[in-house]
Each structure stands twice: as structure tokens, then as C-alpha cells.
Amino acid sequence: MKNILAEAEVSEKFESEFAIYDLPEFLRAVELFEKPALKFNGGSNVTIADANSKQSIKYFFADKSVIVAPTKAINMPDQYVAFTLKKNDFTRIQKAITTLNLPDVAVVGDGKNIKLVATDKKNKSSNDYSEVIGESDKKFTAYFKAENLKIISDDYDVEISKQKISHFINRNKPVQYWIALEPDSEF
């Protein structure tokens, strides 16, 4: 998959290098524990547990050969539009995606407002959810696959480029994502 890149700075030291195929799944697994502790078991898996519980997860690593890593740093093209995506707005769009079973998310500028829209762009009679999240004098529609927006729920400064790439910069943690837009995005 070459449409998402995440970068984070962490203070923890890791015993060994490992690959995770589905990072959102791994993060959700870690979040199941109040005070998670990771124990690396050789080179094939990690045990996630909490000192105050009897539960644990044995989580297997991916083969490093299936992970696509960038060979050079990403240079974000000039932004066409920028806005702040608040955690509450992000949480609501995620709930709408799940509740209405919608595969697409659009960031839409109508010349006045910026809306976040959960939709099925291939089905004109599908249910839609929309919410005004900002203002812009620009007209555009930037499409994402909903599955590509599995990022840490938080506040983000978002930049979108006409070259069909976006940059999500977490406002509270040293985490950022570059997520490709869908080819039918319009500027």
C-alpha cells in the first residue's frame, strides 16, 4: 500500500526492529489496556499486557518484505487549502462512516465553507453525512477512501495539495501522516 505514510517520534526504546502490517489494528490492541506493557518475544511477536489485569494479547509481526517504506523524505507540494480538523469532528465522521457503512470521505469547499462529508461516491442514492468544519473561498472536492483515515483520533492541522496528497499534522503529539487523495478529486 503506497497511499499512507505515518511518522511519529516516541520516547520509548525498542529492543528490536519489527514490522506491523495494520498499524491502526495494533494501536487499537494497545489501547485495550489501561497501562500497556510490551514484551518482545524473539523476532516473531510481542505480548501486550497490563500489570493490573489478567488479559494479554499475543500480536504477530508482519514479514518485513510486505512493508513498503519510502526511500526518501516526502516534500509536500504547495498547499491549495488548509484547515484544522478537531478531534470531535473527526470522531463524528468516523461514527458516520461506521453507522451508515460509507466507503468514502470528501473534504468539500463550496466557495464559502469547508465540509467534511461521509459518502459513497459510486452510489448517488446512498446516505450521506456532512458537517461544516471551516471556511474557505475555494471550490474543491478532495476524496479519501474512508479506510485510509484510520489515524489517531486527535486535533490536526490539515493541508491539501492540488497534486492529490494531504498532510495531517497532529496538534498535540509528534505524529504526522501523508495520505493520498483519490484520483477523481477536483480542484
List each language-model region with its residue ranges.
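Long, charge-dense
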Residues: K64-F83
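DNA polymerase processivity clamps
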Residues: M1-Y59, Q79-F187
